[in-house]
Amino acid sequence: MKKQKNMSAVHLTKADFLTRVAKYEANPNEWKFLGERPALIDFYATWCGPCKMLAPVLDELADEYAGQVDIYKVNVDEEEELAALFGIRSVPSLLFVPMNGTPQMAQGALPKKNLKEAIQNVLLKND
């Protein structure tokens, strides 16, 4: 029996970000991750070709890593404050947020193999 795909990347608004990722307004000088699992956040635009190519890959990864990693998407045109906060100048930009430690940013539509390696090495490694 084939496993049914049911997980996909979750779109975040500023309000969602403040409850699921970080309350940056309350703690502007300190990163305090609020998530229950490590996260990968895709900063994208609807008009961006590479972003459109990356979207189904992120949905596949959301399914493969369900319960281990949360995969989020932030539309930079709708959430300009979040884009500015993270200094997003090009899309797609991917923010890897481990449970402990400093988030790491990557640019471009990375191949699925590279994304899986980053998830394993940055998000799921045991400190």
Name each model feature, range by range:
Residues 85-89:
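A short glycine-leucine-enriched loop at secondary-structure breakpoints
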Residues 36-39, 43-47, 90:
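Short pre-active-site segment immediately N-terminal to redox-active cysteine/selenocysteine motifs
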Residues 13-39:
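A short beta-strand-turn-helix
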Residues 11, 43, 55-81:
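Thiol-based oxidoreductase modules, predominantly thioredoxin-like and allied folds used
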Residues 15-18, 80-81, 113:
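Acidic phosphotransfer microenvironment of two-component signaling modules
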Residues 1-18, 124-127:
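N-terminal targeting signals for export/organelle localization
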Residues 49-52, 95:
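Cys/His/Pro-rich metal-binding microdomains
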Residues 90, 95-127:
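Non-catalytic, surface beta->alpha helical segment in thiol-disulfide oxidoreductase systems
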